[in-house]
A protein has these predicted regions:
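Extreme N-terminal basic, low-complexity initiation segments
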Residues: 1-10
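Alpha-helix boundary/capping motif
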Residues: 10, 15-16
Length: 382
């Protein structure tokens, strides 16, 4: 049976590998954040934070990774984002791929689809409205079948395909709802998609030229997906595989083994697994990663209320504490720092939560989080 490695041992293994920091002594600089628990913080940059003022504030707090989300960044803007970050900070940059996911295109502001209405689904970019929307990648239309269902975003409209026409499809709105631009679309049955988009490949090539040392594979589904990305990134780069689909859960062990770290995206995972079971699978994946001695990050909704408010809820603070008690080694701020009202305040709150965890946890559990064998998977995944 695999041994559960102490948190410090796992962190040491991770940090010994080279990364793209411009300062090789970054971890030992005066004023650098030092965490007894080895908890890493990854911050997503976006409209609220991709500017010199905020990047410098994040650097001052010694966050561990700055994430560029390719799902919300145009390929022509990636170079400028990297240059801006490097001009203000030596924090390593992570390029987070689009991966094997479906998204809708641009739509008119305030679009609401009414239950019972008909809509055309198109493979070519259009300004979406109540009569038509575009989906990408266009390859999904090659295997799309009648009666396939589509859910747009978490609380958006649900569509059912009633027929194919030309290169696109026709659908009926079974549950009305709001549709916003560039939102994830969940299709059942799930289409077969390559692990990387053309945009991902172009971004990775740019990252290689610029010395980017961290890459995240979205929607990792198998060891083959991981291996295919390994072939493209630099040999000394970190590969973080994101477990955020049913296939990723079923193949978690082979994905973990082939990666330098894994990231649990609870939001996307909840599209394919019942919401009430996501906390259970978080614990399973964290324990498996610990047993394979690989760092594991947890993302989505850690401080969701701070996207629009100055303070989190007690439930969110409790979630962070329990995530760390589970054995997670990294916390990911996404919307909180990308589009939130106070990106720096969100990081400060995470730092406070980590500090409280260290003050209390190491007194209560001096040997680390209680290790327990992961329970079996439920029928909803298998």
């Amino acid at each position: 049976m695999l041994r559960a490695a102490p948190r410090s041992e796992i962190r040491g293994t991770y940090d010994e590998r080279p990364h793209a920091s411009t300062d090789p002594q970054r971890k030992r600089r005066p004023g650098a954040r030092v965490s007894m628990a080895g908890v890493r913080i990854m911050c997503t940059l976006g409209p609220a934070s991709l500017n010199p003022v905020v990047v410098r504030e994040l650097d001052a707090r010694r966050v561990d990774l700055l994430r560029i989300n390719l799902s919300h960044t145009r390929i022509e803007d990636v170079r400028a984002a990297i240059d801006l970050i490097r001009a203000c900070s030596d924090v390593p940059i992570s390029l987070d791929t689009e991966g094997a996911q479906v998204r809708c295109g641009s739509v008119v502001p305030g679009l609401i689809l009414e239950t019972g209405s008909m809509i055309d689904l198109l493979p070519t970019p259009v300004q979406g409205d109540a009569h038509r929307i575009s989906l990408r990648p266009r390859s999904i239309f090659e295997t799309l079948e009648p009666n396939a269902t589509m859910t747009i975003d978490f609380q958006g409209a649900t569509l059912r395909v009633i027929g194919l026409r030309g290169n696109g499809a026709r659908a009926v709105v079974e549950r009305g709802g709001r549709v916003e631009s560039n939102r994830a679309v969940t299709i059942a049955p799930a289409p077969s998609l390559p692990p990387l988009t053309r945009k991902d490949v172009a971004a990775i090539e740019l990252g290689r030229r610029l010395g980017i040392g961290h890459y995240a594979l979205s929607f990792a589904a198998s060891k083959e997906d991981v291996a295919s990305v390994r072939e493209l990134i630099p040999s000394d780069a970190h590969l973080i595989s994101k477990i955020e689909s049913r296939a990723g859960v079923l193949n978690m062990d082979e994905i973990i083994v082939g990666s330098d770290a894994v990231l649990i995206d609870r939001g996307d995972l909840s599209r394919e697994i019942p919401l009430e079971e996501v906390p259970y699978y978080q614990k399973v994946i964290v324990r498996r990663a610990n047993r394979w001695q690989k760092p594991v990050y947890v993302a989505t909704n850690l401080l969701e209320s701070m996207v629009i408010n100055g303070r989190p809820t007690v439930a969110e603070a409790n979630d962070i504490a329990n995530t760390l008690l589970d054995g997670a080694h990294g916390l990911v701020l996404a919307a909180e720092t990308a589009i939130g009202v106070d990106p720096v305040g969100a990081v400060d709150m995470v730092l406070r939560c980590i500090s409280a965890f260290e003050r209390t946890h190491f007194r209560a559990f001096p040997e680390g989080s209680p290790a327990a064998p992961p329970p079996e998977m439920s029928a909803s995944v298998a």
